[in-house]
Amino acid sequence: MFPFCDSSSPMDLPLYQQLQLSPSSPKTDQSSSFYCYPCSPPFAAADASFPLSYQIGSAAAADATPPQAVINSPDLPVQALMDHAPAPATELGACASGAEGSGASLDRAAAAARKDRHSKICTAGGMRDRRMRLSLDVARKFFALQDMLGFDKASKTVQWLLNTSKSAIQEIMADDASSECVEDGSSSLSVDGKHNPAEQLGGGGDQKPKGNCRGEGKKPAKASKAAATPKPPRKSANNAHQVPDKETRAKARERARERTKEKHRMRWVKLASAIDVEAAAASGPSDRPSSNNLSHHSSLSMNMPCAAAELEERERCSSALSNRSAGRMQEITGASDVVLGFGNGGGGYGDGGGNYYCQEQWELGGVVFQQNSRFY
């Protein structure tokens, strides 16, 4: 059985009393100590199938040996409970932050080196890269010239081109200097990077501003050219879409009316020609039309222009009425369907006489008006 608290066994004493250590010393770990109770959790977890009788026997054997003799024996080395003290958290954090900072700085330096591997130059337009990309045609011509000159670098070819065209560049610079005066007094640089000698006089060392040096004789030529070809006035954004005035709208309406009248006249002409063809086909080559039919046909042909004039008059009246009601001029879009029919009792031209009727259908302001008129 397990020992109880009231037993006189030395195993009932605390561990630090058994080892004769001071109470202020750190507490030892029971799982790693020499004396371990049989029922301790580390021992039981290590081997759950360990026989209980063997555990009790080993505890009794340990009781037979005094703990003082075991501790004081020279065979057992005395080891410290903690070989190395844990490092403070502040030192670990400082080391980690230092490592991260050094890594970030290296990454930034590497990124900067990858981003800008070539040095840039400062120009009037700001910082610019020394590299440039040529089009296909220009690149072919450029490298052909480089092969002819025998240069091994593109910079030498460009320098040769600049030296060759130095006179033309100086003329351009003189023209710019004559048109614009530099107020800050800063001297410009020539093609080869030195001070421009065009700004200095040959005899003396005093300089003049750019506005007073060469190129003054070209000013009148530019002025005369500008006076000869005046530029058209620029249209502002507000005048781009101007609303037409009343006269322009009235003229547009008048042109629309003329087009509508011409369309009606052409329609009447087509209808008259179609009627003549049908009448000739109905009469036949053997039957000659009588005098009544001829007079009827001639009167019908004479009535066609009258009907057209009447239609135009009605259109004019309807437009005037709509203008009065609306209070302003409106363009009337009308769609007229004219149906002409000729017939008699026998279904053609005969003694019964002819009947002519005109059916009109007008659309005014979304309302459809239908009117039938007959002419005998």
Curated annotation (Swiss-Prot):
Q: What happens when you mutate residue 358 to R?
A: In strain: cv. Canilla
The cellular component terms of Gene Ontology attached to this UniProt record, alphabetical and capped at eight, are: nucleus
In the UniProt record, does the keyword Nucleus occur?
yes
- Name one molecular function that GO assigns to this entry: DNA-binding transcription factor activity
Q: Changing residue 223 to T: what effect?
A: In strain: cv. Guirua
Outcome, altering residue 268 to R: In strain: cv. Gehu
Where do the TCP domain residues begin and end?
114-172
Location(s) in or outside the cell: Nucleus
Residue ranges of every copy of the R domain listed in the record: 246-263
Keywords assigned by UniProt, alphabetized: Developmental protein, DNA-binding, Nucleus, Transcription, Transcription regulation
What outcome is documented for mutating residue 75 to G in this protein? In strain: cv. Missouri 17
Q: In which tissues is it expressed?
A: Expressed in axillary inflorescence primordia, immature internodes below these primordia, and immature husk surrounding these primordia.
Which stretches does UniProt call biased (Low complexity)? Answer: 290-299
Gene Ontology BP, a term = regulation of secondary shoot formation
Q: Pfam families annotated for this entry?
A: TCP
Biased composition, Basic and acidic residues: where in the chain? 207-219, 243-261
Q: Where is this region: Disordered?
A: 179-266, 280-299
Matching PANTHER family, A to Z?
TRANSCRIPTION FACTOR TCP18 (PTHR31072:SF226), TRANSCRIPTION FACTOR TCP4-RELATED (PTHR31072)
Q: What does this protein do?
A: Transcription factor. Involved in apical dominance. Represses the growth of axillary organs (e.g. lateral branches), but enables the formation of female inflorescences. Regulates the number and length of axillary branches.
What name does the UniProt record give this protein?
A: Transcription factor TEOSINTE BRANCHED 1
